[in-house]
């Protein structure tokens, strides 16, 4: 590293957006203007090269970004670590992981479509991790682009205190640049790749508009900054420096979202966006980070981005490369050097860092040391994503990230012998990389089942198996992750007895099972022991809980996990000789099976939040399609010839929806969906599912 490390001159930022808002294109421009690449390649470019940040073949082909690549760019005197995050909802765990290690973010919005469902998801994730953000309204060269409307949508839909700090000079094919309201100058991009930025006086026809929006901006800044408020009340003009300081303060304090505008594809406004990153987003030293002290019962303590303090670093992403596993890390405190020993806080293993690299999409440069606030990658370290690493002087953990449950599964099997060799290797790798990708073996059908966040999520992995591991697989029908639950309280009284010469088995348990309302911590099973007077010895109580819990893995109704059950153990009996841990565990399992039917079991299915956008003339058929799929319409909004339909639809009805939507709208409709909640299925469907399951079991037992 040629430059001296100065933490105040560092920005760790991500770009998050809805799919197709132009995120990879914007990153590509940032790399170009920051001197990291020497030619610009489009995402679906004619030159067949594909964008630099999309480093997997699959990404270049589909034009979507899957793995977030980390790149370091120099901009003026600043060092910017840029994390490219996927915008497709099926990959939200990647987005969450990136946000966890960022200090600030750019929320990218399409100037035509504005705030879409995925923008809402990403915004919710940013709020969860308290990430300060700028909004960049992109694609102003497109027909129907309107940054004023998009800013209103940020305020109404996302409840953000959004304020325009730039207004466009011309829109659609007239778009030439923007007016910066902080210094009241016009910025116009020129040159083949927009590399020259001309600073001019504001065009005469825009002066009044600029003054109006500057007043709105100052009014909003007065609410978050007392110095500006004073000047505002005295009707004095604040200086450019005062305005920028107030925007910075409001942004870092999460009280304000500055809105910038431009067109990355047409090379307009990206350099000023990079300036805004350095002006308004925090350095690692300004973002408060906390860790949990393992020695003090996970008590929270503050981390300081000080290289002299003990090391705390988080592994937030893993990637397999031809040279072995690459682990992306964010250093929160202390420093990390090549050859240092670091301790994985999950398994307490001490490992030596053989190689430390700085990443540029998929090229790398070796470095010797990295300091607090930096994002780097390590080779030769075996760990899972989300593990915390420290040096010998401290035991701490960054809190574990929120990982959602999977909603869809597929049975897969290798096609032939060649595929079989790499089959488990591929699954193992994907599991390590992505906590939402799960693999298990179904004992009864003897199949390998993969589960994930949606159809596309699993499709991508099936594709990657073929491409990266030369492993063709046969894919079964997608299976929805149903759940079973109970709807009424039911008492149980069960005695387990077995006498087979020698010591037998004996356990008696009495109590009730009852529905468990949704818990704050997301728990789906609760066990309460109310046994008094030693009716069951203490050491056998956990056995009863274990028995009940084991039985919830596969419900008797349709063979899916049972959730939302509270088991109360009230009484019981034991035998001095014949009672054992095993006997009480078996009693727990059998008691649940026996009492289950009288607790009126119901089947729950995943309900998805669907957002479909279609041209107005197709609204009728789009709504009809949703109704046919047992969907309920939540809202419809119209904008400029298009209609956005928000609905809740059961996932099981969504297979093949994209094909149907395309044919009904002549390819003009698009949709995105994400998991919303679990809800009971209609009675007739429950009976059908139960019948199928019983028939399947009967066939397996023959």
Swiss-Prot record:
Q: What is this protein called?
A: Elongation factor G 2
- List residues of the tr-type G domain: 8-285
What are its GO cellular component terms? cytoplasm
> Can the keyword Protein biosynthesis be found in this entry's annotation?
yes
Q: Which residues bind GTP?
A: 17-24, 84-88, 138-141
Stored InterPro entries: EFG_II, EFG_III, EFG_III/V, EFG_IV, EFG_V, EFG_V-like, EFTu-like_2, G_TR_CS
The primary site where this protein sits is cytoplasm
GO MF term list: GTP binding; GTPase activity; translation elongation factor activity
Q: From which source organism is this entry?
A: Bdellovibrio bacteriovorus (strain ATCC 15356 / DSM 50701 / NCIMB 9529 / HD100)
Localization, UniProt: Cytoplasm
Pfam families to which the protein is assigned, alphabetical:
EFG_C, EFG_III, EFG_IV, GTP_EFTU, GTP_EFTU_D2
According to the entry, what is the taxonomic lineage of the organism?
Bacteria, Pseudomonadati, Bdellovibrionota, Bdellovibrionia, Bdellovibrionales
> What does the similarity note say?
Belongs to the TRAFAC class translation factor GTPase superfamily. Classic translation factor GTPase family. EF-G/EF-2 subfamily.
Q: Which domain of life is it from?
A: Bacteria
* CDD domains xrefs: EF-G, EFG_III, EFG_mtEFG1_IV, mtEFG1_C, mtEFG1_II_like
